Structure formats: C-alpha cells, structure tokens
Amino acid sequence: MYILLTLLTKSTMESSCDNFEGLEHYYYTDAEPSSKCNKFQASGGSGVVMAESHIMSSEAPPKSNPGLNIRTNCRMILNLLREKDCSVTFSPEQPLTPVTDLAVGFSNLSTFSGETPKRCLDLSNLGDETAPLPTESPDRMSSGKLESPKTQFVQFGGLFTPDLAWKAKKCPKRNMNSVLPHLLCSTPSFKKASGGQRSLSNKENEGELFKNPNCKPVALLLPQEVVDSQLSPTPENKVDISLEEDCEMNILGSPISADPPCLDGAHDDIKMQNLDGFADFFSVDEEEMENPPGAVGNLSCSMAILLSGPLLNQDVEISNVNNISLNRSRLYRSPSMPEKLDRPMLKRPVRPLDSETPVRVKRRRSTSSPLQPEEENCQPQRRGTSLKKTLSLCDVDISTVLDEDCGHRQLIGDFSKVYALPTVTGRHQDLRYITGETLAALMHGDFNSLVEKFFIIDCRYPYEYDGGHIKSAFNLHRQEEVTDYFLQQPLTPLMVQKRLIIIFHCEFSSERGPKMCRFLREEDRASNDYPSLYYPELYLLKGGYKDFFPEYKELCEPQSYCPMHHQDFREDLLKFRTKCKTSVGDRKRREQVARLMKL
C-alpha cells in the first residue's frame, strides 16, 4: 500500500507540486454514491484492493487536463486512508454531511455496542425544563421508527460506561420502600401510565434507563416522568405529561402521601437501577417490601389518618357535676384522647366527714363550693359556743373607718363630750369653724343652757381692733398675752354640765387666728396629761371680721372696718410684725432651754 502511495505521489509531484495545497480539503458532492466511490471497508488490507478497483472503474477524466485526474485520485486515496485510521463507517442508506457523519460515527463506536447509552446526571439543570439536550441523528428521527419509547442520547467517550452484569451480581434487586418511609410532604409521587407497557422488540434497551438514586433530597424531589418527558421529543410523551399533571392535581389533596406500590416487575427493576451505588447502603430484602414491619410501614398511614380523620367529639354531661372526681386536673392531657372529661370542679379535695375542725366549718360556710348543700346536710350541729371569725382591718370598709374618724372628730379635745356649737368645715381640717350666724346666736343667749361662759379673742393688730371689733371681744395678738391670760390662772366652769368655750378670729381667719388657736392647744397639752385639757372646746370664726361686720353691724363697736394694709397704718404694721417675730424667736429659745433642763 505504501509503495502504491509513493508512486502516485511521486508522479504527481513531478507534474505540479504547487497544487497539493488542496489535499487537506475534501468535500462530498450530491451525486449518487455509486457514481463517485465505493464504501471503504475497515478490515485488514482489503482497503488497498478496493481503492485500486475504484481507481480502475472510475470514469476517465477529460484528456485536456491529465494532471487534474491524477490529483483527484490521490485525494480520494488519501481521504480513504485517513478514514481507515479513524475507523469511521458510513450509513449505506443516504449520503451524510460532515456534522451527521461525526454524530453517526460516535454512535457506532465499539464502546457503546450492545446497549443504549444515556447522558450523565447534571444536577444543576434539573429545575430547567427548557434546557437543550443532545438528541439522536436526524435521519433516524425522519424515519419515524423508534425501537424504544425512551429517546437515545449521544454520550461522549469517557463519561459513563455501564456494566450491567457486574451490577447485577454485586447489587441484587432491593426495595427502598421498607427502609425509608415515603412521606413526601407537598410533593406527590407519580407513576407513569405507560410504564408497564414496553415493546418486546426493545430488548437491548431493557433495563438501560438513566440511573438515579430513588431516595432524593428535598430539593430534588422531581417526578421521574417529568425528567423522561424532557429527554423525549416524541408527541406521545407530551400526552403523558398532561396526564401526569392531572395526576399531580389529584395527589396534592393530601399533605402526606405514600409511594404507590409497583404493578409489575419491570418497574421494580427500574427503581432498583435508579439506586445506582446507594443500594449497598440501603438494601432490604424483597420479602420485607411485601410484608413491611409495623413501625415503619404504618407510619405514613397512621399520620394520614390522624390528619385527615374527623374530629373526636367529647361528650360532657353537665347534669353529672356531683359525680365528677375531685382530683387535680392534668395539665398535659392529649386533646385527641376519646375519654370523657373528668376535671375537678373544686380546687381543694373534700375533707373526711369525721374531721370536725374549725377549718372545716369555715369551708362548709363558703358559698363558692357547689357541694355546700350536701355538706350542710351531712354536718352535725355543734353544741355549745361556736367560734366566730374576728374582725380584721382588711374586712372593715373604708367608709366605716372614715365615719368613725368623723365621729371622733365631733368630740371635744378631751374626748369627753361633743361640741356644743354646730360646726362647719373650713380651710384648716384640724380646727373647728363656726359661722357668723352661730356667733350671733351665742351672743344673743341661744346656747346658755350648754355654755356657761365664752371668750371672743381678736388676733388682729391694735389699730385694726380700734377701727372696729365685735362686742365683748379681747384683743390678744401676741402669744405671750394668750399664755398669760389663759394659762397663768386657768379658768374653769362653775357648773360641770356647762361649757367654757373660746372663739378666735382675725381679719380673714386664715393665718393669725388659726396660729393662735393651735398655740393655745399645744400649751394646754403640755400643761396637762393627755387627754386632759383646760380648754378642750376651741372654735374659729369662719370668714373673720370681714364677713361678720357686713351682716351683724349691730354686734360691732365701733361699727366700722379697718383693714390690715391700711395706708394710714403702714408704720404700725411693720412695728407689730417685728415684735411678733421677736416674741416668736424668744419663745422658741425658751422652749429649747426648758427641754434641756428636763434632760
């Protein structure tokens, strides 16, 4: 063969060496294959004989260009030798283009002899339904005859080489249904309608489906039929997709669905082959598939019954309240238990009938217990004096306390009698006020049956007193004067049944009169043992001389009114205020000295 090639090349090189640049390009024409060349057979040395016979039987080129005929023959021989080295065979049915030639050549490689190769699993494209997939050659699609319902895919060398005989010995048929409970929440399990009907002539592709693990993760729970529909361009599979969508809508009614059982042995083979290499880790006998254990096989069924079953009605009889047990309620009782409610009506258990204690008597008298009538009937009558609940401060109404306080306030300073004159409320809550009308009635002798003698103390400054005052009133504006007049020689009534009362007032009875009244009470308390007092009944004229003068001028002398801040008595006001403050300071110092001497 090499000798022939050398002779042809040498003769061609002598004629025209510059025309061999086109040897690298070779194209088939649209003429019939029998008129151009015979098929080159890739077997031993028969290729040379076929090439020689082809050269001898080819048509003679035109005589005008003998060098072109030699170059054409050399190109044909070189291309046939190149095709022999690549071991490429051509289809005898029709001429093939270079792209179709490449596809058919790879499909006829010896690596894929005896089975239909499938593409490897690409996990990144599972969610993309429109991803382009490699399909078979166009000449087989145009023929309209498919040996297998599954589409054949071109797989390039080195990616996947199945070995069914080795896997059949190493991995026997197993079933994963009894190992892992198929609780596909929100993901129904599909079963193809035409999965059990397979062509008998498709024996070489039987059991050669794409192998993927049956136990998919949550993110990869895709139906097997959807994947098959993506790999098949035939219209029959498109019809199956619509049927599968209807099946999906029917199955999505329940949140938990079990994987449907296999109907034939071929489907079991498909499931076991989908396990790929994971069957060694999750292998279970086929007998366990038919008779699954109770703990695992009934898991999905029991959960489905629990979620989809009707609600249990718990009958509660209100009339049988007395028959309910008096035990503490269970906090964590299951709401699905069919038993009746035996909850207690009382917080505390019933004491034995023979325990006669005061605690039991108190509980028997409680109105919150529904068992009160029965306990009263069963309780024997106690003889003698019964224990009574003492009155505590918590049980006393606050209004009662206030009423009692008001009752105590109606008593005079030594708590021996009530006030002889009607009193009213005023600015100072600790002092007793009388109105001008009451003072006028007192001066007219309306209270002579109760009052033996009364004193009206005018606490205003002397210029105010000289400008107008109440008849028979004493002007005592200094504390020393009050102490000397009432405490140096205390006054006592001649009759024990009658009273000796003192009435204080100033211009408004808001500052000077209340201060003098409190001072006398404090000095009187200090001079006597509590609660004894020389002058237990003290009053304040409400509104002072200002309110009394307009209404009762006849009881005032002179019948005039001189205010404290009169323009003509400013100097007198400053002088009397200074004396009052000095006297107050001296009094405080004397009190402190007296206290130190007592210590």
From Swiss-Prot:
A GO-annotated cellular component: cytoplasm
GO MF entry, a single one: protein tyrosine phosphatase activity
SUPFAM superfamilies found in the cross-reference section: Rhodanese/Cell cycle control phosphatase
Domain Rhodanese: 450-557
Keyword Cell cycle carried by entry: yes
Chain spans, region Disordered: 125-146, 334-384
Organism superkingdom: Eukaryota
Biased composition (Basic and acidic residues): 339-359
Family annotation (SMART domains): RHOD
Known EC number: 3.1.3.48
Keywords in alphabetical order: Cell cycle, Cell division, Hydrolase, Mitosis, Protein phosphatase
Gene Ontology biological process terms from the UniProt entry: cell division; G2/M transition of mitotic cell cycle; positive regulation of G2/M transition of mitotic cell cycle; positive regulation of G2/MI transition of meiotic cell cycle
Catalysed reactions, semicolon-separated: O-phospho-L-tyrosyl-[protein] + H2O = L-tyrosyl-[protein] + phosphate
Homology family: Belongs to the MPI phosphatase family.
Role summary: This protein functions as a dosage-dependent inducer in mitotic control. It is a tyrosine protein phosphatase required for progression of the cell cycle. It may directly dephosphorylate p34(cdc2) and activate the p34(cdc2) kinase activity.
Protein name: M-phase inducer phosphatase 2
Lineage, broadest ranks: Eukaryota, Metazoa, Chordata, Craniata, Vertebrata
